[in-house]
Curated annotation (Swiss-Prot):
Subunit record text: Part of the 30S ribosomal subunit. Forms a loose heterodimer with protein S19. Forms two bridges to the 50S subunit in the 70S ribosome.
PANTHER family: 30S RIBOSOMAL PROTEIN S13/40S RIBOSOMAL PROTEIN S18 (PTHR10871), SMALL RIBOSOMAL SUBUNIT PROTEIN US13M (PTHR10871:SF1)
Origin species: Geobacillus sp. (strain WCH70)
Pfam family, one: Ribosomal_S13
Keyword match GTP-binding: no
Its biological purpose: Located at the top of the head of the 30S subunit, it contacts several helices of the 16S rRNA. In the 70S ribosome it contacts the 23S rRNA (bridge B1a) and protein L5 of the 50S subunit (bridge B1b), connecting the 2 subunits; these bridges are implicated in subunit movement. Contacts the tRNAs in the A and P-sites.
Name listed for the protein in its UniProt record: Small ribosomal subunit protein uS13
Family: Belongs to the universal ribosomal protein uS13 family.
Gene expressing this chain: rpsM
Length: 121
């Protein structure tokens, strides 16, 4: 397995897919990286030369990925919570932040249902 940005990327997959195993790199970013490095998207990781791997590592090194990106995202969320804005309050309460409906759905954010007992008639 080749290591890029501290992540072991799978050898048997195409390079464009393998790069998406790195947090912060999706398909479009992976394609841009390979175009800049001059590597074909169809190449398998095991077929890359050390020179090509070095060029890819250098380009990925200039991007904000993995730990740095995770830290920035968590600091942004902490900042929103501290200033007490609407989005921060939604984060604090564990509710959807981007305006989604919460009457019926939003189970991913709210967690399992907490059933409320009915008053007997």
């Amino acid at each position: 397995m080749a290591r890029i940005a501290g992540v072991d990327i799978p050898r048997d997959k195409r390079v464009v897919i393998s790069l998406t195993y790195i947090y912060g790199i999706g398909k479009s970013t992976a394609k841009k990286i390979l175009a800049e490095a001059g590597v074909s998207e169809d190449t398998r990781v095991r077929d890359l030369t050390e020179e090509e791997l070095g060029r890819i590592r250098e380009i990925v090194g200039r991007l904000k990925v993995e730990g740095d990106l995770r830290r920035e995202v968590s600091l942004n969320i902490k900042r929103l919570i501290e200033i007490g804005c609407y989005r921060g309050i939604r984060h604090r309460r564990g509710l959807p932040v981007r305006g989604q409906n919460t009457k019926n759905n939003a189970r991913t954010r709210k967690g399992p249902r907490r059933t409320v007992a009915n008053k007997k008639k």
